Amino acid sequence: MEKKQNKRAKGEFYELMAQRYLEQHQLTFIARNFQSKTGELDLIMRDQDSFVFVEVKYRNTSNFGSAQEMVTWQKQRKLQRTALFWLMKNKLSVEHTSFRFDVVAIHAQGKEINWIKNAIVEG
């Protein structure tokens, strides 16, 4: 149980780091850890007229691949489904609402942050 709590605390720490990084780049915070049956969205931000669904990935080393490589095809599908659910839940039209999927990859205890806009292409 302690290992799971420690992992969750670490996840929250890096999500907050990513949120602050994006806020420094003029994005507005909307929500963190939105959960549904389809999955979880780490961060929901707003970039001018667009909603930004952000997946935060952290890796201490790149021995097993970079943080952004950890966003698998299956994870991308879950993110897309969860984002569409969030839009519908908030009475926003999928066809008439601007949104994108970004990844914030954090390496080396936060010394390196890589923000990848449009990392996941809808479709």
Swiss-Prot record:
Signal peptide: none
GO molecular function, one term: nucleic acid binding
Source organism, top-level taxon: Bacteria
Entry-linked InterPro entries: Restrct_endonuc-II-like (IPR011335), tRNA_endonuc-like_dom_sf (IPR011856), UPF0102_YraN-like (IPR003509)
Any Pfam family matching the protein: UPF0102
PANTHER family on file: UPF0102 PROTEIN YRAN
Family, per entry: Belongs to the UPF0102 family.
Protein name per its UniProtKB record: UPF0102 protein VF_2212
Originating organism: Aliivibrio fischeri (strain ATCC 700601 / ES114)
Lineage, top ranks: Bacteria, Pseudomonadati, Pseudomonadota, Gammaproteobacteria, Vibrionales
